[in-house]
């Protein structure tokens, strides 16, 4: 299937924000481990979060998707699976990484595997830290990469972990740490990639009753025995998914309002709004909606997006329509995502006519007259959505395999159709 995107003029549109993918994953795991029942209201039901839900069900957790919510019967810190379990995490790095540490809370071995691309995504630093905390971790294929077999128990103690490839290594251990036999203390020798997601992890843990102490992003300590407690929990809107909607106003001109976002959220992808404002858009955050409006020309900027990785491609698409070059830094770890996002973005923008320079940790886009092209998203939802938005400004864009957006924003195409943009 192919979605064809034509050029459109200035917009005046309003969209509801999809529920947060990151919060939904973490709330599912906290609810599954908790004492008692948890009701998760307004969860994101997408390919990624369904993989986490199915993984928890494989571990023996009763879970039911209901209209507008998920009901989870917590296992009080011990997964009741009757024997060894193999969990297929598909192309969800979040599912595989977060469940790797939680698997130590099963009474039986757990094997985590996934798609061919997943088997190319490293988990060595996470495995090393889990071994230091008492886990038995074995790679059944290439050392340092899935499939990964988890057994033993989470004793706790101290470990050093490198989160420079992914902060999910750190989040994985933190989420399971309340159920370790003793307190868990993690030291991070390098600045973690996507560090704002550690704020999301800590937020969910605290709301479910865990006790966590931290020194910035350098050291974390989780108290053993302060278990999660089942609760009613509402998932906030997703700034990552909202970035595509805001970008429509930036590339086409006009105004877009997105409802359902927390204006004080710890989500790092809120920084995308700062980038749009610096480029010349006006941003207004109210209690009911966040509104982006563009009435004049955009200008290029220099910005560090290391804590907002999921909006880098969206920002690159916007930058291609500006009046001067944009340099985005903090991009090194994007090669380990669902695709090599920097490489795919650079190649596609060059084919469209833009000038692009790539270094180990940066992406510079020099605007030039653009034309539409066929886009192969490489099964990466964020690539498909970013270039669909750019297509609204350029026209002649053909997005292959559009169903890949099901991973995080299942209603993306319908949202654009609903506002007459496709």
Curated annotation (Swiss-Prot):
Binding site for 3-phosphoshikimate: 21-22, 26, 166-168, 194, 310, 337
Disulphide-bonded residues: none
Pathway assigned to this chain's UniProt record: Metabolic intermediate biosynthesis; chorismate biosynthesis
GO BP terms in the entry: amino acid biosynthetic process; aromatic amino acid family biosynthetic process; chorismate biosynthetic process
Molecular function via GO: 3-phosphoshikimate 1-carboxyvinyltransferase activity
Positions of phosphoenolpyruvate binding: 21, 93, 121, 168, 341, 382, 407
Transmembrane regions: none
Pfam family, one: EPSP_synthase
Subcellular location: Cytoplasm
PROSITE patterns: EPSP_SYNTHASE_1
E.C. numbers: 2.5.1.19
CDD domains: EPSP_synthase
GO CC aspect terms: cytoplasm
Catalytic activity as recorded in UniProt: 3-phosphoshikimate + phosphoenolpyruvate = 5-O-(1-carboxyvinyl)-3-phosphoshikimate + phosphate
EC top class named in words: transferase
Active-site residues, Swiss-Prot/TrEMBL: 310 (proton acceptor)
InterPro entries in alphabetical order: Enolpyruvate_Tfrase_dom, Enolpyruvate_Tfrase_sf, EPSP_synthase, EPSP_synthase_CS, RNA3'P_cycl/enolpyr_Trfase_a/b
Record's keyword terms, sorted: Amino-acid biosynthesis, Aromatic amino acid biosynthesis, Cytoplasm, Transferase
HAMAP family: EPSP_synth (MF_00210)
Main function: Catalyzes the transfer of the enolpyruvyl moiety of phosphoenolpyruvate (PEP) to the 5-hydroxyl of shikimate-3-phosphate (S3P) to produce enolpyruvyl shikimate-3-phosphate and inorganic phosphate.
PANTHER family in alphabetical order: AROM/DEHYDROQUINATE SYNTHASE, PENTAFUNCTIONAL AROM POLYPEPTIDE
Family according to the record: Belongs to the EPSP synthase family.
Subunit text: Monomer.
Protein name: 3-phosphoshikimate 1-carboxyvinyltransferase
Gene: aroA
């Amino acid at each position: 299937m192919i979605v064809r995107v034509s050029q459109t003029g200035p917009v005046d549109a309003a969209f509801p924000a999809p529920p947060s993918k990151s919060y939904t994953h973490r709330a599912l795991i906290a609810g599954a481990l908790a004492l008692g029942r948890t009701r998760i209201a307004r969860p994101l039901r997408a390919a990624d979060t369904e993989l986490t839900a199915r993984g928890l069900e494989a571990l023996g957790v009763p879970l039911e998707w209901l209209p507008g919510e998920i009901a989870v019967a917590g296992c009080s810190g011990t997964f009741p699976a009757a024997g060894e379990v193999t969990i297929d995490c598909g192309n969800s790095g979040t599912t595989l990484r977060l469940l790797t540490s939680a698997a130590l809370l099963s009474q039986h071995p757990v094997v985590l595997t996934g798609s061919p691309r997943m088997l190319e995504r490293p988990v060595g630093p996470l495995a090393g830290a889990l071994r230091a905390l008492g886990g038995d971790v074995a790679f059944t294929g290439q050392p340092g990469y899935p499939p990964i077999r988890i057994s033993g128990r989470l004793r706790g103690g101290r470990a050093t972990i490198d989160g420079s490839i992914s902060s999910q290594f750190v989040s994985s251990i933190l989420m399971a740490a309340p159920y370790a036999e003793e307190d868990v203390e993690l030291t991070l020798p390098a600045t973690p990639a996507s560090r704002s997601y550690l704020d999301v992890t800590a937020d969910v843990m605290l709301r479910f009753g865990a006790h966590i102490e931290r020194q910035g992003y350098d050291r974390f300590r989780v108290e053993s025995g302060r278990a999660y407690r089942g609760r009613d929990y509402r998932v906030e809107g997703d700034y990552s998914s909202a970035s595509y909607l805001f970008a429509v106003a930036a590339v086409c001109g006009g105004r877009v309002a997105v409802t359902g976002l927390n204006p004080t959220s710890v989500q790092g992808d809120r920084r995308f709004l700062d980038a749009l404002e610096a480029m010349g858009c006006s941003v207004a955050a109210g209690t009911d909606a966040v509104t982006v409006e563009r009435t004049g020309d955009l200008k290029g900027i220099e910005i560090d997006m290391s804590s907002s990785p999921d909006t880098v491609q969206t920002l690159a698409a916007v930058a291609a329509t500006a009046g001067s070059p944009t340099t985005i830094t903090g991009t090194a770890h994007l090669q380990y995502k669902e695709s090599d996002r920097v490489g795919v973005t650079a190649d596609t923008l060059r084919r469209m006519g833009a000038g692009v320079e790539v270094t180990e940790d940066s992406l510079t886009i020099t605007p030039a007259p653009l034309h539409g092209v066929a886009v192969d998203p490489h099964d990466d939802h964020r690539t498909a959505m970013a270039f669909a938005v750019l297509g609204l400004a350029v026209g002649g864009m053909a997005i292959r395999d559009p169903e890949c957006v099901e991973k995080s924003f299942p209603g993306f195409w319908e949202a654009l159709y609903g506002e007459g943009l496709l």
